[in-house]
Amino acid sequence: MRPLARLRGRRVVPQRSAGELDAMAAAGAVVAAALRAIRAAAAPGTSSLSLDEIAESVIRESGATPSFLGYHGYPASICASINDRVVHGIPSTAEVLAPGDLVSIDCGAVLDGWHGDAAITFGVGALSDADEALSEATRESLQAGIAAMVVGNRLTDVAHAIETGTRAAELRYGRSFGIVAGYGGHGIGRQMHMDPFLPNEGAPGRGPLLAAGSVLAIEPMLTLGTTKTVVLDDKWTVTTADGSRAAHWEHTVAVTDDGPRILTLG
């Protein structure tokens, strides 16, 4: 990963050529396929480790490599974060899905040297109204951020759009959502995590410009309660500080002259 200090002075979010965006979209398609396979396999009695094995199989059969596996010592190909887990949940045989669970899966793949990164949230069977609203609000916040990925905007215009999407969802669903503090999106390309960091809230009009070819991984994380989190003893799993449930949606998105291009679609 390029040292962050070298990138903080950039005036433009790093750009990719048309061919490089196509290469990233190929990696993103692998991620999308893995997430579809996980979603199809998730059922009561299924362990989160078995979902990880499915993802790794799909990724490797596509000629790609899991981005997460071994990253700073991370031991799996996906992050499986269930109920009050926000992000970075480590899959295990002991963690078995049950009806009503709220499941967030984050997945990354590298193909021909280019990374794709995406996350989805879904229920095991029917969700409570609150959990359904939480997941939808998070997805809608993501869509709001994607819509702001246009030439001439600045980094925090995307952050502000995500926050505005969250506040609009609060009105739509008649409940408050916590925007998880300290976590957000990032640049992506030849490395999975690159500058700039993308907050999920904040004032608009600041930070580097978006230009054609700029790419960001946009990933809002919302809770039904607090904005605060705790990292468990495994040094990876992030949970809500108050035990409230959390949701996480993510896409890798490029700025083009024709508008936003989602690179993690199937």
Curated annotation (Swiss-Prot):
It catalyses: Release of N-terminal amino acids, preferentially methionine, from peptides and arylamides. Belongs to the peptidase M24A family. Methionine aminopeptidase type 1 subfamily. Optimum temperature is 55 degrees Celsius. It retained half of its activity after 10 minutes of incubation at 55 degrees Celsius. The lineage of its organism: Bacteria, Bacillati, Actinomycetota, Actinomycetes, Mycobacteriales. One of its GO terms (molecular function) is initiator methionyl aminopeptidase activity. Substrate binds at residues 88, 193. InterPro entries: Creatinase/aminopeptidase-like (IPR036005), Pept_M24 (IPR000994), Pept_M24_MAP (IPR001714), Pept_M24A_MAP1 (IPR002467). It comes from Mycobacterium tuberculosis (strain ATCC 25618 / H37Rv). It is an enzyme of class 3 (hydrolase). Removes the N-terminal methionine from nascent proteins. The N-terminal methionine is often cleaved when the second residue in the primary sequence is small and uncharged (Met-Ala-, Cys, Gly, Pro, Ser, Thr, or Val). Requires deformylation of the N(alpha)-formylated initiator methionine before it can be hydrolyzed. This is Methionine aminopeptidase 1. Inhibited by various metalloform-selective inhibitors. Its cofactor is Co(2+); Zn(2+); Mn(2+); Fe(2+). Binds 2 divalent metal cations per subunit. Has a high-affinity and a low affinity metal-binding site. The true nature of the physiological cofactor is under debate. The enzyme is active with cobalt, zinc, manganese or divalent iron ions. Most likely, methionine aminopeptidases function as mononuclear Fe(2+)-metalloproteases under physiological conditions, and the catalytically relevant metal-binding site has been assigned to the histidine-containing high-affinity site. GO terms for cellular component: cytosol; plasma membrane.
